A protein has these predicted regions:
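Gly-rich Lys/Arg/Thr-decorated short loops/hinges at beta-loop-alpha junctions or inter-strand turns
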Residues: 10-30, 51, 105
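Proline-rich intrinsically disordered, low-complexity coils
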Residues: 12, 16, 65, 78, ...
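Charge-patterned, long linear interaction tracts outside catalytic cores
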Residues: 26, 41, 136-192, 196
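Glycine- and other small-residue-rich loops at beta-strand/loop junctions that grip anionic moieties
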Residues: 28-34, 57-62, 111, 142-146, ...
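Hydrophobic alpha/beta core scaffold segments
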Residues: 38-136, 160-165
Length: 197
């Protein structure tokens, strides 16, 4: 137990750990309370055109090669964009060094699956400030599907009326052609293809 942890004290020398992209630094702690405490500055940057768009990249992850899409997407995101990330999908990009915009890191790690709540709180707060709906914000949701937790995130977003969600790299096995048609018609959900598209 705890006595063993105290006694063994870890590695005898520094033991570097890297993320999936080889990065050795990860900045975390950007749940809604941290982001919203800087909302004034973020809103100013949006109004000044210094932040042109916000991407939320998150969801469940897996080992399939197509999942590099999320890393590639983050790397290709223009320098005047922020990336909110959460859940296991964040490990595809949270060790990238993409710089900052006026002191705000371009990658904001909001936490795990349950912290999708934080991303929703931030989106709703921004919509209130700009007197618009979440769908009218300069915001794109890029969700990675792998297991049931991602369904909870997706259903929550759909229940809030959020549209234009990008979903992939594969679709849930239980989504029939008819269900997919309804999702596309009512919510304009799109299956991811290539980063360039």
């Amino acid at each position: 137990g705890s006595e063993m942890c105290i006694r063994d004290r870890g590695y005898p020398e520094d033991h570097p750990m890297t993320g999936i992209n080889g990065g050795s630094t990860v900045t975390t702690g950007f749940a809604h309370n941290a982001v919203l405490s800087n909302a004034g500055h973020i809103v100013e940057l949006i109004k000044a055109g210094k932040i042109r768009h916000i991407f939320l990249i998150g969801g469940c992850d897996g080992a399939a090669p197509g999942r590099s899409y999320y890393t590639d997407f983050a790397k290709a995101a223009p320098m005047d964009t922020l990336i909110l990330t959460l859940a296991c999908g964040k490990y595809r990009l949270n060790d990238l060094d993409l710089g900052s915009i006026d002191g705000i890191p371009r990658i904001l790690d909001m936490g795990q699956c349950n912290d999708a709540y934080s991303a929703i709180k931030v989106a709703l707060a921004l919509a209130e400030v700009f007197d618009c709906t979440v769908n009218d914000l300069p915001l794109t949701l890029v969700l990675s599907w792998y297991e049931q937790k991602a369904v909870c995130i997706l259903l929550t977003l759909l229940s809030l009326g959020v549209k234009n969600i990008l979903l992939g790299p594969t679709l849930p096995a239980f989504v029939s052609e008819n269900v997919w048609k309804i999702l596309v018609e009512n919510y304009n959900i799109q299956k991811i293809s290539t980063v360039e598209e």
